[in-house]
């Protein structure tokens, strides 16, 4: 009985350690608000190939991000989506601060395909016109004052 309990406790500690590592890999850099980090990760008015575009994101992380979506629209247009009807987030049913874009936008989906060394991340690019769903929150003091509610998470593309 004792070895089984001890083994279970070790497994639990390992699981907790791995989950905290996963959270730290997806955490935003401390110097940015959630909206600023959203803008860096997901707003790109002029499409670039993913291998180049992802450098702006990967330089703040200790690894090559596996995948990412760039919306080819303005931050102000995405802020306007925050005014659409609230809905449960399709990507996380425990959140109800999501909003559907209502219109399709051009976007680029990036998928890591090459070496996973931070200095040499290689991506494939897929272009599409799709709807998107964003989570929005009240602005942080570091966010532009003209936007009381700002996008903080790209939940889903549809």
Curated annotation (Swiss-Prot):
The keyword Repeat does not apply. Coiled coil: none annotated. The active site is at 42 (proton acceptor), 153 (proton donor). Keywords: Endonuclease, Glycoprotein, Hydrolase, Lyase, Lysosome, Nitration, Nuclease, Signal. Its EC number is 4.6.1.18. Glycans are attached at residues 34, 86, 92, 111. It comes from the Eukaryota. Substrate binds at residues 65-69. GO terms for biological process: chemotaxis; defense response to virus; innate immune response in mucosa. It is found in: Lysosome; Cytoplasmic granule. GO terms for cellular component: extracellular space; lysosome. It catalyses: an [RNA] containing cytidine + H2O = an [RNA]-3'-cytidine-3'-phosphate + a 5'-hydroxy-ribonucleotide-3'-[RNA]; an [RNA] containing uridine + H2O = an [RNA]-3'-uridine-3'-phosphate + a 5'-hydroxy-ribonucleotide-3'-[RNA]. Belongs to the pancreatic ribonuclease family. Interacts with and forms a tight 1:1 complex with RNH1. Dimerization of two such complexes may occur. PANTHER family: NON-SECRETORY RIBONUCLEASE, RIBONUCLEASE. This is Non-secretory ribonuclease.
């Amino acid at each position: 009985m004792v070895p089984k309990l001890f083994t279970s406790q070790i497994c639990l500690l390992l699981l907790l350690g791995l989950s905290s590592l996963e959270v730290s890999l997806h955490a935003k850099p401390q110097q940015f608000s959630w909206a600023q980090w959203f803008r860096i990760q997901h707003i790109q008015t002029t499409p670039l190939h993913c291998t180049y575009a992802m450098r702006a994101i990967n330089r703040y992380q200790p690894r090559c991000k596996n995948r990412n979506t760039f919306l080819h629209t303005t931050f102000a247009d995405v802020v306007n989506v925050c005014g659409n009807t609230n809905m449960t987030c399709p990507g996380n049913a425990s959140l109800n601060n999501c909003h559907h874009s209502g219109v399709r936008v051009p976007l680029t989906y990036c998928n890591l395909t090459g070496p996973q060394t931070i200095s040499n991340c290689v991506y494939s690019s897929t272009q599409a016109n799709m709807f998107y769903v964003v989570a929005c929150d009240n602005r942080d003091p570091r966010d532009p004052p003209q936007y009381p509610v700002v996008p903080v998470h790209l939940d889903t593309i549809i």
